[in-house]
Amino acid sequence: MLSLSVNTDMRRIAAPTHSLPMRHLHTLQALTLVLLTGLAACGRDTAESKRHALIDSRDWYDPLSLDPAHATDVPSGRAVSYLFDGLTRFAPDARVEPGLASRWEVSADGLRYTFHLRSDVRFSDGTPFRARHVASSFRRVLNPATKAGSVWPLYPIKGARAFASGTSTSLGVETIDDSTVVITLEEPFTIFPKLLAMPVASMVPEVIGATFNEQPVGTGPWRLVEWKHDDYLKFARNAEYFGGAPSIDTLIARIIPEPSTAVAEFEAGTVDILYVPEDQTKSWQDTTTRSARLASAPALRLWYIGVNSTRGPLKDVRVRRAIAMALDVPTLLSQLLAGRGRVAAGVIPPSLEGADTTRKALAYDSSAARALLTQAGFPKGIDVELWCSQTAPFPRLAQSIQAYLAESNIRVKIVQRDAASMRAAARAGQTDLVLKDWYADYPDAENFLYPLLHSANRGAGGNVSFYSDATFDRLVDESHRESDAARRAELYRQADSLGYANMGLVPLFFYNELYAVQPWVEGFEVPVIFNGQRWLGVKLGRK
């Protein structure tokens, strides 16, 4: 997620020694994060001692919920990370760190995790955090009466699925004493601690009141002061936070639906950090005063074409490979996103263990693509629909894909829908091709391989290509049980290679996060996981 010369290392930005002129599932609109030193209301500050806004433009709408049990969208997940903690947590660079658990051990058979809890933690209402809160929090999420939005991160726990279905009250969570909890799994799952850093695994009090969503009680570094829906959320720092209180007194998350508005505010100096809209990437990179402010990092995010392998010609791997070969992906990346990413030759981002950075993507070759179609029995080409969301830049990208495919006798009809309708159609198996992106839930190659290509996840689970291969499934399943990191990475590489050879989906590129940062901001780290930035290390100097 150095110095201010971010062209050398665009990952972390420190404050300069002098003042400079004032002047990012979820992708193009704006959630404004405002950092102030007092509990000042939203708006422009005039005194030099006060602070301005910090914008994260990946989110443009209100959080759906501040209750971890119902935090299924990115804005909610980020807000939950401010207010609550899990046993583990993500750093901005996606490393998994101890959270409410200071350490843990795993049994030799990989089934029992013993978590040792911190003794210096209190909820914001003053209640000490204890091991019983782990058991009650997990039981609450899994209780059918809670109607939690996304409980699958807890499914590895023994008895969790039966508990969630209401057929059992037995759950593999045992409190040994106030500071020790043992979690037993159904089967070994080596990356289980990463799942515990997700919002749904956050700790909440034993008793949840009716106003919990509007007045949440957590252990996190921030406390909610005010939530003006569709306008802003105001947070005050938790001075007693066990991990060290934030340096800034107040954090305000303003909702800005229009990226152009966010850009204008940044250039007016009223916000501190801007998530650069995709369609403005080149403008920011090519303008000297703007480019000096840029900070970037590879995100755990893949753009791809889901190819429904159960429909007509798309059942044939030669047709799927022809689609991939008909696309000049480097040119698409350069012209539409100003090179803001890296061409993909698989689904695992290069920064994750298991990625094969030496694998080359299929080269653009329209003649070879037409030959493959002929071999597959389609000498006159094929007709398909390409679905995409109405959110920029997907329509433009879809039009470019349409033009390339036409050169190889792949005739495309573009179907634009709102994101929810498009997603529902794809998961129901109603699409031929669907243009999508995938943003990691947790930083592990498994979170790309399993959701996107495992047969158990077809349809509603997210495998909208309906790809199914027994060898691929076996490799991923074996990786769940493998405790040796090097061997697990090799299983990931083998699965990714097989999925790419079979073109279970057509990977396009891995995306880069790109922010603009005001010169008075210190310690900002570009987050590569959605809930990795909690603003603990950010400081604001004089303008």
Where are the regions that the model predicts?
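Extracytoplasmic/peripheral linker and loop segments enriched in polar/acidic and small residues
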Residues: 43, 173, 407, 411-422, ...
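Surface-exposed, Gly/Pro/Thr- and Asp/Glu-enriched linker/hinge segments
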Residues: 43-54, 97, 123-187, 206-225, ...
